[in-house]
Amino acid sequence: LERDIAAVVARAPVRAGASVDAAGGPALGRDCQAPTFFHARPLSDPFGGTDLANGRHPSRMFEPAPAPGAPAETMYLFLGPLQFSDACLRLYGHPQLLAVAAAVNGDDFTPFNEAVWVKHPGLGASVAWHQDGVTHWDSPDLDAGTHGFNFMAQLYGCTAANGVWVVPGSHAQGKLDIAALVAAAGSERLPQAVPIICAPGDVAMCNRQAVHGSFANASRDTRVTINLGFHRRAAVLDVAAGGVHNAPAVYDAARIRHRARLIAYAIDARRQRFPDEVPFHYQPLADAPGRWRWNAAARADIHDYNLHDLSI
């Protein structure tokens, strides 16, 4: 994982919109239609107080001044990582993680989205307080798990200085007025929030309805977090959604099955790498055993796969 992530970071566009990497070679993502690499000014808050991501980040985080000589911008996030990293794909197929997803969201669980957050020391951008969900807040069937959850695998671990903070219990309180919470606190330091602190290799879980965010990484420690998100099938089937991670669409059964093939490819990629491990049995695609083999054709098939994310 460390080698793969380092290789992806090295081949990222040198700046927003660039087609070359820092070494002048062809950048990853240059031929993708889906959003892939995101850049921001060092220690800035690119989302807070804007209409981006459906305006779900209503308040702005404090933006420390970067050190003299800092670059004008830095890459802090990339989406669709399973097409760029075989190690990330194999992580996605981890039988224990998928078993947890099934236990939480049911055996017919679906994908949501994958992302890798890169918080370089002294450079990493903040992520303003928000709740991930945007679709089902007014549903009479809303409960504490309606908008799914994210696994957050930590490559180097995370600290209070560079990690995600979360407001415990907020996932069960519906849509909250985050701007009012910040105003009541008198700053972006919400007194109710606690940090997610992990060692290298730990995997945290975060409910997508929880109020959470992270401060600019003014620390000396790097954080790399691999997010793997999952939904209940009932929360996405025939639902009109999108607009944050993917274009608005109605998620019919065909789209869900098409997107879920990434789980099957990941399971097979992991089976090839770890033949003595018992692979996860993914029920929704069990009707076509052997259909999704990880090979060169599969690699071509998942190009731009995140165009079909299932964002709610």
Model-inferred region functions:
Residues 1-129, 135:
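Non-heme Fe(II)-dependent double-stranded beta-helix
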Residues 15-20, 203, 210-312:
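Non-heme Fe(II)/2-oxoglutarate
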Residues 58-62, 131-134, 179-192, 222, ...:
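Short, surface-exposed loop/helix-turn segments at secondary-structure junctions
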Residues 86-89, 99-100, 137-141, 153-155, ...:
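Short helix-to-loop capping/linker segments positioned immediately adjacent to catalytic or ligand/cofactor-binding
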Residues 114-116, 151-153, 226-230:
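A structural signal for short, well-ordered beta-strand segments
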Residues 116-123, 133-134, 156-160, 170-173:
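Short acidic/polar capping segments at secondary-structure boundaries
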Residues 128-148:
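Acidic, His- and aromatic-enriched active-site or binding-groove loops in soluble protein domains
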Residues 145-148, 156-215, 235:
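Double-stranded beta-helix
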